[in-house]
């Protein structure tokens, strides 16, 4: 069997090299799903790809890194991840992905990211270079962030602190009560489950209505107006400046 090495290129790892311009040469460069250069070269300046192709024009004095036996692939992005927010599910102190409360739009996931998480180097070794970390728990859980899985601290790792607001739509599944179920294992009646589900949906409507009312009140510039963090976090969502991601599993 023919064996070969595969390299997933994480440019931010090569801090010393990136001080100037660098040309990376490789046996194969997978630029896009349909664009491949064999062999190929990549010109990088300050961590940004400037040119890519079978052969690029190397600026005078730039560093040449020859990886002739390796293959370069784009890094993967892990969407809707708890990377850096959770370590061991069985230990509550290591889980920062869930906040207390059902409506917490002012929660920002990047603040709780642990840059020393043992899961980060494992993900990076498998080709994942970035992750969209999402707060979980409740109905409106907060704002996700895009982080790079390389850096000395959370500030350096964070690419975008505010990606989107996340809303977890109430489950529509109904559990059929069993005649022999007792105690905590006995589910509520079908009518009670439907009532609870409808109530959760009404609470979402009410929350957005209150956020809109806050927006209009603030626009009127009343005296002694004090900002409220939760409603302030909703303003860019209501104005369309920040997207909202709705999670619906059923």
Describe every region a protein language model picked out.
Residues 21-36:
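Short N-terminal segments immediately surrounding and downstream of signal-peptide cleavage
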Residues 119, 124-250:
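Polyanionic/metal-chelating signatures
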Residues 33-73:
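Histidine-rich, glycine-flanked metal-binding segment
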Residues 5-16:
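Bacterial N-terminal signal peptides
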